[in-house]
């Protein structure tokens, strides 16, 4: 729109902002992260400065805890976690050597998530913090998942319990939905809500940027890609329920993956009552909103067929987590979108082919 194009944004839901939608809970007055916690973090200054235009951002450090059979510990695994878990008082070098001795010595190149974990941290820490959580989150054995999933959870040999190491970490003071509404507040932008995408709509536009699931866009004609979906069990409590925003639950004795207390995601606000949601993961079925692309071997083979379908046309670009079938954080999606807008406008001005994806899906 800022480049002079009339833009029509269509969303199948009755609100903008997608999975990062936030809304004020009527019963408690707490700002709710409706589709689970979203903490913005980035070291990309261009992304950070772009977002400053559309809302007030409050500094926020995400300090996640894990409830295990041995007690509650900090994540990511850090020096405090290690000393507390093993009942030791090691320094950084001692702990590094200790974990190295725990690590599996017979795994050279990890073939899956379990082998990656065993190679990095050994069986005790893996069993306590990752195995059960992975089974519940992904609905399959960790040996069926690629090794690179575990790279999102580093081990630190200091007392830093900040979940992220990004330079900018914050939450929007008035919620993500307000930020997105401000982005869309432009005379060349028209928004239509509660309208599912239909292939016939494509004829109405010179170009379509599709952020929905790539397989759904083609009517699942090549088959369904694997996704995980989420659902939540809500409860309201007086006062402070758990003392922190997020507690992961990696044990298999409870079916939920984590517990979120929304008031702690707005620490600048004051509320007497507290909204708590227990989060559950499930396989995506017809009618479910997809959240996490699984990207198993069979999915990648199927994805290649959908990519070929995309490459056979020229007036549709697939964007975001679902459009590229990749696990992406918010800051990555925004960076990709800014880069894509620049590249698309440049290609349009030259009369050259437009980009087909905001990020290569394969």
Which stretches of residues belong to each language-model region?
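Active-site/ligand-binding neighborhood in enzyme catalytic cores
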Residues: 66-73, 79-207, 218
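Glycine-rich FAD pyrophosphate-binding loop
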Residues: 1-26
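Conserved beta-strand segments of alpha/beta enzyme cores
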Residues: 6, 31, 56, 188-192, ...
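Short hydrophobic core segments
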Residues: 10, 204-215
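Conserved beta-strand termini and adjacent loop/short-helix elements that scaffold enzyme active sites
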Residues: 60-62, 192-196, 262, 319
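A conserved beta-strand/loop capping segment in the N-terminal third of enzymes
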Residues: 21-33, 40-94, 153-158
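C-terminal segments that line or cap access tunnels to active or ligand-binding sites in enzymes
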Residues: 205, 215-355
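Structural/interface elements that position substrates and couple domains in central-metabolism enzymes
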Residues: 49-50, 125, 242, 254
